[in-house]
Swiss-Prot record:
Ranges of residues in domain DCUN1: 58-291
InterPro entries from the UniProt entry: DCN-prot (IPR014764), DCN1-like_PONY (IPR042460), PONY_dom (IPR005176), UBA-like_sf (IPR009060)
Domain UBA-like: residue ranges: 4-41
Entry annotated with the keyword Acetylation: no
The entry's keywords: Ubl conjugation pathway
Matches recorded under PROSITE patterns: DCUN1
Protein name: Defective in cullin neddylation protein 1
GO molecular function, one term: ubiquitin-like protein binding
Source organism: Candida albicans (strain SC5314 / ATCC MYA-2876)
PANTHER family (UniProt xref): DCN1-LIKE PROTEIN 3, RP42 RELATED
Lineage of producing organism: Eukaryota, Fungi, Dikarya, Ascomycota, Saccharomycotina
Intrachain S-S bonds: none
Gene Ontology terms describing biological process: protein neddylation
Superkingdom of this protein's organism: Eukaryota
Amino acid sequence: MSSKTQLRQQFCELTGTSNTTATKYLESVRYDLARAIDNYYNKHPNKAQVTKKPVKVKIDDRLIQIFDKYKDSEDPNKIDIEGTLTYLGDLGISPDQIESLSLALLLKSPKTGVFTRENFLHIWQYYQCFDIGAMSEFITRFNKDLVNNIGGFKDISTVSDDENKSVPLKFQDLYNFTFKFSLETESQKFLDLDTAIEYWKLLLPIITETYSKDNKLDEEFKNHVNERVEQWFKFLTDTEYMTKKSISYDSWSMFYLFFKEIVLIDPIKFKDYDEMAAWPSVVDEFLEYLHDFELL
């Protein structure tokens, strides 16, 4: 059975349509199964409401071989830190690049340096990436989509549901994922302050750059924003003001909104800041810090 025949068969099984319909949608996207299914449900949203029998997807042997190359010697159902570093190297990705976080989000990594067999195999099977080259090319596109906040890719756990319930992945999803991904244990509730700062140094410039590009803002504006970011880091490491050594998920996720809705709108005066709004205490303390040093 040819690969195109297999893809048509999978399309028919997943959508309950005819071979003719499958061929039409697959040919329009050069036999990219994921895009073909998305396009079908975009044009026929009512079809997504039909309850379909779960389909057991056969995993391509090439994917199994790739996973087995990197799997942990003590636990064959996961890739651990050593295998992950080798995998990233083969993909041409450095661990400190934003692409490594995008890959972790894509493959639903439970924590830093770990990929599970089930997610690795099923997600790459869904996207029809069966070799390192295809995976590398896909990650480049996926990361670009996230960084530019386009939302062109969906959480694959939702794509077979009602189209209105399908969840597009955007940069905020990557940002929030980073917190939980960085925790060392499942029971851990707070992120070490130094770790939080390192990830903010990676993520905040991307938010600034995207906002500046979308709103055609100049270098002077970006310099004002970057100055506020540096003041945020200085505040966090000032033991007189910041007695906590960790960041809660609420503080992490709300700072994203504070940065987009307050800092990026007016980095000089914070004109939209409302001290009566439900910001986490660390944000209120940051504003107090700025006032004390006559920085605001």
